[in-house]
Amino acid sequence: MNGELSERARWAIVVAFAVAMAWVEAACVFYIRALVDRVEPYQVNPLPISAALGTVELWREAATLAMIVTIGLLAGRSWRRRIGYAAIAFGVWDVFYYVFLRVICGWPKTLFDWDILFLLPLPWWAPVLAPVSIALLMILWGTVASQGGEPARAPRWPWALGGVGVVLALAVFMVDASRALPHGREAVLRVLPTTFNWPLFSVSLLLMAFPALAEARRAAELTAGVRSRHTAENSGRWSPP
């Protein structure tokens, strides 16, 4: 990307890329689910995938993540902004993935429909609302991080809390598959969760929100400081002798 592009232009380009990528992702997932007669994933034997097709699907997921990281690296001019743009790309991609699936096949019908989010390292199960909530947080944090100034020194405690939140969310997503793991691969593929731990997920979401909230607060303070300096400079420049 050209160094002359403003951060707003870079943000718009990343969003456009993520939206287009979401359509490709939704189309691919629709093809696969139609092929195995699982357009709606929450049904008996939810992952009737052959070994060959399963391997291809795992590599497709890995390639998707590589594309998201790549657009972040290309868009950002510092590591902070690169991570921010990657977060924006992931969040926008995830939200529009569900929007386009709804357009293509009428699923999900509600935000509480169950979905298989990822297969790495185990199947992740959750209602659609859960990944969408995380995606919106990523868009918020990524936008503030990519559009704001570079901090002299950012506190680490919000990231520590956010990391704990990520671990908790992963545990909630993979708890059913992990319980079936001792019974072998077939048992893991046939898992069909019946309940979702919303209280624990809510705690994890709150913890994951700390980096975004801390970043937003820092950006607001930085903006207020810049305005104060400009006001002081203008007052000194135009004050009578």
What residues fall within each predicted segment?
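Interfacial segments of alpha-helical transmembrane regions
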Residues: 6-18, 76-92, 152-164
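Alpha-helical transmembrane segments of multi-pass membrane proteins
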Residues: 18-35, 172-176
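Interfacial helix-loop-helix junctions of multi-pass membrane proteins
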Residues: 31-38, 99-118, 179-189
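Perimembrane loop-to-helix junctions flanking transmembrane segments
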Residues: 36-53
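Membrane-interface loop-to-helix entry segments
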Residues: 48-70, 119-140, 195-201
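Structural signal for the C-terminal ends of transmembrane alpha-helices
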Residues: 71-79, 140-150, 210-218
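Small-residue hotspots
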Residues: 84, 91, 135, 142, ...
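Membrane-proximal helix-loop-helix units in multi-pass membrane proteins
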Residues: 95-153
